[in-house]
């Protein structure tokens, strides 16, 4: 299976809408007011136009997406690059593809192209596994806030992309 990492194009919008809607089912069930959870086609098209929306294709099919924001959502809290709208097609979840896309964006885009040694993202305290997943991937909480929209406590997390420990496998 060939893997391709690339910027999304407008022609990908319907496929991204389908993936994002299905991937964000739990977010809707938790009552979180995240734009990606209830995005329509116009919002997906705007996201592709305004931001840097990346996809992972396997054998020609988009299976995961993540967005490097060019908007101002967190600029008052941090000048660091902010990633959002991370989604993996449910039939491909828990197979490592989301992690591969996140690693690729961190290494090739955030560090490689932008030259930023750190990256940020946000998630909700009440989500049953996202905080822990990001922490296992090296993200650390650095800000806690309540947006007063019913979502409860939100965490802003950041990850240092340089000086990461390298693991050596011994044969």
Located regions from the model:
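Residue-level marker of the N-terminal boundary of ABC ATPase nucleotide-binding domains
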Residues: 2, 80, 131-133
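Conserved Rossmann-like nucleotide-binding pocket used by diverse enzymes
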Residues: 4, 82-84, 120
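A short beta-loop-alpha structural element at the N-terminal edge
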Residues: 4-18
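Acetyl-CoA-dependent GNAT
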Residues: 10, 21-91, 102-104, 108, ...
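Short alpha-helical
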Residues: 11, 15, 62, 128-129
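Non-catalytic, surface-exposed connector residues within folded enzymatic/regulatory domains
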Residues: 77, 95-96, 151
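Conserved glycine-rich acetyl-CoA-binding loop
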Residues: 89-103, 124-132, 136
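C-terminal "cap" of GNAT-fold acetyltransferases
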Residues: 115-137, 143-171
């Amino acid at each position: 299976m060939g893997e391709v990492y690339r910027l999304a194009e407008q022609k990908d919008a319907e496929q991204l809408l389908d993936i994002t809607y299905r991937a964000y089912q739990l977010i809707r069930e938790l009552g979180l007011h995240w734009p990606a959870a209830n995005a329509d086609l116009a919002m997906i098209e705007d996201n592709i136009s305004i931001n840097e929306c990346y996809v992972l294709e396997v054998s020609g099919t988009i299976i995961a997406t993540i967005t490097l924001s060019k908007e101002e959502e967190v600029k008052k809290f941090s000048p660091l690059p902010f990633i959002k709208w991370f989604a993996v097609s449910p039939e491909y979840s828990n197979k490592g593809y989301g992690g591969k896309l996140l690693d690729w964006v961190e290494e090739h885009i955030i560090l490689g192209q932008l030259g930023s040694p750190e990256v940020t993202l946000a998630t909700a305290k009440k989500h049953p596994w996202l905080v822990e997943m990001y922490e296992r991937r090296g993200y650390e909480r650095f800000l806690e806030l309540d947006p007063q929209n019913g979502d409860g406590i939100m965490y802003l997390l950041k990850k240092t992309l340089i000086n990461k420990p390298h693991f050596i496998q011994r044969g």
